[in-house]
Amino acid sequence: MTEAFKQQIEEEARQAVTELLAQAKLRKGDVFVVGCSSSEIVGGHIGKDSSLEAAQAVYAGIAPVLAQQGIWLAAQCCEHLNRAIIIEREAAEKYGWEEVCVVPRPHAGGSWATTCWKQFKDPIAVEEIRAHAGIDIGGTLIGMHLRRVAVPVRLSLSKIGEANILCARTRPKLIGGERAKYTEED
């Protein structure tokens, strides 16, 4: 992988997370899930061409932006680990998510989860979470880890590297019927 392509991936990842955060209106302590197929980023087929370099470039673009705002990064593993989540122990404890025993590797968990495991201060794996927003890079199906109700968010870019991206924020369910009010101004 060329240096120029790594820089492109990093910048696209940074831009995507920055744009999504601007629309999602997350608060300090919220959770942001990222599913990332490094294979798709480099133009391969999901699960077939894992690239630590691509995953590291995505991490370099996303992690500092989230850290600056005090938002927890949750890294979704691949299908071989049942799409488990790698997250900092402190975040999992805050939200009451139960730890499971597994350490991701590039071909069992994916390069993205492996990269995050190595970069996090005190990483653990959990089976499921309810994140406040997230980015799906390359068709990794993050929906199972989003809070209800997920709201699609369009960005100015539609790819990171060669991988398509889909983004979502979440909002509380609207309840109550015709007399209900949903804002203070109503």
What are these regions (language model features)?
Residues 1-32, 52-65:
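N-terminal glycine-/serine-/threonine-rich phosphate-binding loop
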Residues 18, 22-25, 63-71, 117-125, ...:
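Generic secondary-structure signature for well-ordered alpha-helical cores
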Residues 24-26, 108, 154-159:
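Solvent-exposed alpha-helices and their adjacent loops that cap or buttress functional pockets
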Residues 41-46, 50-57, 64-83, 108:
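Active-site histidine-anchored catalytic micro-motif
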Residues 114, 118-186:
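Glycine-rich, aromatic-bearing surface loops/beta-hairpins
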Residues 69-132, 137-138:
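Ligand-binding beta-strand-loop-alpha-helix segment within the catalytic cores
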Residues 4, 29, 42, 67-70, ...:
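Non-catalytic beta/alpha edge segments that cap or flank active sites
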Residues 30-35, 73-74:
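Short glycine-rich phosphate-binding loop at a beta-alpha junction
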